[in-house]
Amino acid sequence: MNFKTALICFALLLIGTLCSAYSNQERQRDSRRVAEIMRTSLDDNTKIHRIQELLTIYNRMAPSLRPDERARIDRFISRHTEGIMVDGVPSQGGARKIFKKTLSPAAKSVATGFFTELGASLASLFTSWFPATTTERNH
């Protein structure tokens, strides 16, 4: 009986891992989305509003990154999101949430710099996964 239980648990673990894997198709879709976000985010408010979408894409891709890549980006995100103030008060609801309220000019500058650097980091990772020749053939 123990063998059957262990086998069932192992099968469920294996199936769960395979179903939740970050597929090549999802990577390509996210790669195109990051490129679109970076290309179409021209003003500060748009950049600030799209930070959460970049963080969502990063959270999807993070488990498939090398440990050093993940640690580098996690440190960058933590360094910039923990200190973001909204109306002079630290943001609530988690370290990785950016509220869509009016920010002071200094905070807006920090947030847009964060957007630019995070977007560039994600784009760089996608470029390393999909060299230009592969990406160009898929378009």
From Swiss-Prot:
Q: List the disulfide bonds.
A: none
Q: Where in the cell is it found?
A: Secreted
Q: Name one GO cellular component term.
A: extracellular space
- From the UniProt annotation, give the residues forming the signal peptide: 1-21
Question: What is the top-level taxon of the source organism?
Answer: Eukaryota
Q: Which family does it belong to?
A: Belongs to the Turandot family.
Q: What does this protein do?
A: A humoral factor that may play a role in stress tolerance.
Q: What protein am I looking at?
A: Protein Turandot B
